[in-house]
């Protein structure tokens, strides 16, 4: 065989080998397991600044994007109705306190003196009636007075004796003042009236709403002059220091997202990668179930909601930024 034929065969073998190798590489690249990218979003804790008092908003002191400190004044409410209720509650408390003081102090000196005089008069009447009865009894024993006269004298004596006892009891009541039960009841009414004053005052303090945290104003829902219902969120705030990643994870990748496990995510908007730690996971509803297309090698997969906290402070991040998490094969 000539050298030319050998060279030709050699070239064919080399070309065939290269072609075969290329086919093998293409087959590998086509069918090798591919990395999957899951997309989640950054979220932050949101707070509503509202008031327990319904009324007309007097002024809103912040606007979207403002960074404010805890305790800063956010908005104020004008409530003339509440001020009227406070005046009413204070008047009720003054009346209840005056009544309680009167009961505690006891009867006036004039009342005590009057009760004593009535008792002394009844006592004198009883003494006179007793002496009269004794005289009539002696006359009756001697046959001078009739039985009727004696009975009348005795009845008069008994009546004046009971009148004296009743007058003495009233005198004792005047000396002792009100009963302990009356004093307790009057004091309780005073405390209840004071409680109403304190309740209205606490509501009045809430007409000036302050920031519950250090954070950023994310939205202002009402403006000055508008009516605000009780508990309505007038201003929304977010705490950018309390942020987390929320991501939907198919069931087959749950092993990569155990609670406490760390993983890396890429934030395209910030052009940086950062570490996250899983703090919570929970199954999502049936709407998030991945349905199998056949019954041979696949199954219906649930999706799980995973929340993970960043392990470093994210500068310049905004709520809603995407985070890409790559699952390696």
From Swiss-Prot:
Keyword tags: Membrane, Transmembrane, Transmembrane helix
Subcellular location: Membrane
Effect noted on mutating residue 256 to D: In strain: Hp921023
Membrane topology qualifier: Single-pass membrane protein
Primary residence: membrane
SUPFAM superfamilies: HlyD-like secretion proteins, Outer membrane efflux proteins (OEP)
Name the UniProt record assigns to this protein: 36 kDa antigen
